[in-house]
Amino acid sequence: MRILGLDLGTKTLGVAISDEMGWTAQGIETIKIDEAGGDFGLSRLSEIVSQYGTDKIVLGFPKNMNGTVGPRGEASQSFAKVLENTYNVPVVLWDERLSTMAAEKMLISADVSRQKRKKVIDKMAAVMILQGYLDSLN
């Protein structure tokens, strides 16, 4: 069972995958997207889903700190429907509050340069989202 973890932004989509046992999450890549133009990187995502035999997707669901759903959360809900219809696999919306900030802090503490952080932050956030979900199962 392989589970895909995604962190949706307006310009990038962070991608992570679980190991076959569903214990650990590893970052795969950051896909460039254009949310405003309707390009969500589905062609590349289709290759990844096929390559890993994905049977579930965990999508980061950004809520406001008070638990309400704002514009980014609504965008994630819409994208979840697209994913379900495109790949015919269940999509779990996972509370991702502060995941990008936590990923940034981890990269800063590892002394990763600002330029390198920009390239991997969304992939790291996807790892944290997926790992949080996997930990909740085990």
Swiss-Prot record:
This is Putative pre-16S rRNA nuclease. CDD domains: YqgF (cd16964). Could be a nuclease involved in processing of the 5'-end of pre-16S rRNA. It comes from Bacillus pumilus (strain SAFR-032). It is found in: Cytoplasm. The keyword Acyltransferase does not apply. The keyword Cell inner membrane does not apply. One of its GO terms (molecular function) is nuclease activity. One of its GO terms (biological process) is rRNA 5'-end processing.
